[in-house]
Swiss-Prot record:
Pfam families named among the record's database cross-references: MoaC
Protein name: Cyclic pyranopterin monophosphate synthase
Binding site for substrate: L89, C90, H91, M125, E126
Pathway membership, UniProt: Cofactor biosynthesis; molybdopterin biosynthesis
Keywords of the record: Lyase, Molybdenum cofactor biosynthesis
Molecular function GO terms recorded: cyclic pyranopterin monophosphate synthase activity
Reaction catalysed by this enzyme: (8S)-3',8-cyclo-7,8-dihydroguanosine 5'-triphosphate = cyclic pyranopterin phosphate + diphosphate
SUPFAM superfamilies: Molybdenum cofactor biosynthesis protein C, MoaC (SSF55040)
Biological function: Catalyzes the conversion of (8S)-3',8-cyclo-7,8-dihydroguanosine 5'-triphosphate to cyclic pyranopterin monophosphate (cPMP).
Gene3D superfamilies: Molybdopterin cofactor biosynthesis C (MoaC) domain
Subunit structure: Homohexamer; trimer of dimers.
Gene: moaC
E.C. numbers: 4.6.1.17
Organism of origin: Streptomyces coelicolor (strain ATCC BAA-471 / A3(2) / M145)
């Protein structure tokens, strides 16, 4: 596992602490009222590993339930908008835009979500939720053909804006 793929931080630096845990160890929603409203973006990606027959169907006649990629795209967009309903301490944000790209590779459906906002906190969770919900939808759409589809590699690829600045996975 590379440094970019695992959690980091020693816990000694105040920047290394878990912001959603208070001094007593209780969960809390971070107060972002003092932060500046800035333009922010986040891009996340993930894959759904599928059987060769699923790849063949997605590239051709489609799967029995219908247009899997279009359905997953809409589901991912809806997921991004519903993130604070799914993740308890996530702030409701004014999501400005969600772009979801799905492509069929030789062994997988590859998913990338880019989410934009102008707000006080970032949209990494919205991008991750978009990818996750799209991936779950792909699994649902192909399960009649491939009960062994696997969701994998869901992760933030990039974030821009905010106090902590820009970050890109290397």
């Amino acid at each position: 596992m590379s440094t970019q793929d695992r959690p980091s931080g020693s816990g000694q630096d105040p920047q290394d602490r878990l912001t959603h845990i208070d001094e007593a160890g209780a969960a809390r929603m971070v107060d972002v009222s003092g932060k500046d409203v800035t333009a922010r973006t986040a891009r996340a990606s993930g894959r759904v590993l599928v059987a060769p027959r699923v790849v063949e169907l997605l590239r051709g006649e489609g799967v029995p339930k219908g247009d899997a990629l279009a359905t997953a795209r809409i589901a991912g967009i809806m997921g991004a908008k519903r993130t604070p309903d799914l993740i308890p301490l996530c702030h409701p944000l004014s999501v400005s835009g969600v772009k979801l790209d799905l492509s069929v590779a030789d062994d997988a459906v590859e998913i990338t979500a880019t989410v934009r906002t102008t707000d006080r906190t970032g949209v990494e969770m919205e991008a991750l939720t978009a990818v996750s919900v799209a991936a779950l939808t792909v699994v649902d759409m192909v399960k009649a053909v491939d009960k062994g589809a696997v969701i994998t590699d869901v992760r933030v690829e990039q974030k821009t804006g905010g106090k902590s600045g820009d970050w890109t996975r290397s």
